[in-house]
């Protein structure tokens, strides 16, 4: 799933986009996942109405980016030189477990493509090219090209992520990744190719955080799709039973639920219908 790329950080900036990471390199290395993450990902993805409610905020952005009229889940960046530009999502999260997908074509990332979360106070524009998300104490970001985590980056060095990377290695990423924000535990994590990469940031409890990215590539287009969320309260017993049955069947056999000797109402419940 993950592929290590050796070389200096400078070479990482200009490298050709890597092929889809080879999963064999991370076998046995997956860190412990948040307790309820599998439950969230087993749920049907949010519908379009919910996705639009959690989409990029056209009123909370750098002036050099705009949300597309024909695709409200996607923003486009104008080709402005010596500028780093960001945008926040509409909905901030202070509680619960949330996941959203970021689709950012590798060839449109350039030297500073950063994905993460931010408070409402974090800046969304900077002169020059920089890892804007994570540059101050109001945002937390993963630089996709350098494979570095930044928070208060003006005063602290970046940290390699995923954790198995060496100091001069980067991580070949596909076009899409999942962001996992657990405000009950106060953590931010990422999933690539179905592989949980471990906790990137801790200590986020007590804040209200919004999805955010910052970009430098002219004409880049980045799409955000909210996957789903779980409230902090314990799940009802029926939901836990459904999760247990679906886990026992496995993803490949979920299509067989319709043939089980069960009442139709229960079959429907198992299929989230």
UniProtKB/Swiss-Prot annotation:
User: What's the domain of life for this entry?
Assistant: Eukaryota
Q: Does the keyword Cell membrane apply?
A: no
Q: Where does the B30.2/SPRY domain start and stop, copy by copy?
A: 34-233
Write out the GO biological process terms.
intracellular signal transduction; positive regulation of protein polyubiquitination; protein ubiquitination; regulation of circadian rhythm; rhythmic process; ubiquitin-dependent protein catabolic process
* A GO molecular-function descriptor: ubiquitin-like ligase-substrate adaptor activity
Keyword Ribonucleoprotein: yes or no?
A: no
- Pfam families per UniProt: SOCS_box (PF07525), SPRY (PF00622)
**Subunit info?**
Component of the probable ECS(SPSB4) E3 ubiquitin-protein ligase complex which contains CUL5, RNF7/RBX2, Elongin BC complex and SPSB4. Interacts with CUL5; RNF7; ELOB and ELOC. Interacts with MET. Interacts (via B30.2/SPRY domain) with PAWR; this interaction occurs in association with the Elongin BC complex. Interacts with NOS2. Interacts with EPHB2.
What is stated about domains? Answer: The SOCS box domain mediates the interaction with the Elongin BC complex, an adapter module in different E3 ubiquitin ligase complexes. Essential for its ability to link NOS2 and the ECS E3 ubiquitin ligase complex components ELOC and CUL5.
Q: What is this protein called?
A: SPRY domain-containing SOCS box protein 4
Q: Which organism is it from?
A: Mus musculus
Q: Give the gene that encodes this protein.
A: Spsb4
């Amino acid at each position: 799933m993950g592929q290590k790329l050796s070389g200096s950080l400078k070479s990482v900036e200009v490298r050709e986009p890597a092929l889809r990471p080879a999963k064999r390199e991370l076998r046995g290395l997956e860190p412990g996942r948040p307790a309820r993450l599998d439950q969230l990902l087993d749920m049907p993805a949010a519908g379009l109405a919910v996705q639009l409610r959690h989409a990029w905020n056209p009123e909370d952005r750098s002036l050099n980016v705009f949300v597309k009229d024909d695709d409200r889940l996607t923003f486009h960046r104008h080709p402005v030189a010596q500028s780093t530009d960001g945008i926040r999502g509409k909905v901030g999260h202070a509680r619960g477990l949330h996941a959203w997908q970021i689709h950012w074509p590798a060839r449109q990332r350039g030297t500073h493509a950063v994905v993460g979360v931010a408070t409402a106070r974090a800046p969304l524009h900077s002169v020059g090219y920089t890892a804007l998300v994570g540059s101050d104490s109001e945002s937390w970001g993963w630089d996709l090209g350098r494979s570095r985590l930044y928070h208060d980056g003006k005063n602290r060095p970046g940290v390699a992520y995923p954790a198995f990377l060496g100091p001069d290695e980067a991580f070949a990423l596909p076009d899409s990744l999942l962001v996992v924000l657990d405000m009950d535990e106060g953590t931010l994590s990422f999933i690539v190719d179905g592989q949980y990469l471990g906790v990137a940031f801790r200590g986020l409890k007590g804040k209200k955080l919004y999805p955010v990215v910052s970009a430098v590539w002219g004409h880049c287009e980045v799409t955000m799709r909210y996957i789903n969320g779980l409230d902090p309260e314990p799940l009802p017993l029926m939901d836990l039973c459904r999760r247990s049955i679906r886990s026992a069947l496995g993803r490949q056999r979920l299509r067989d639920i319709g043939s089980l000797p069960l009442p139709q109402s229960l079959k429907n419940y198992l299929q989230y219908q």
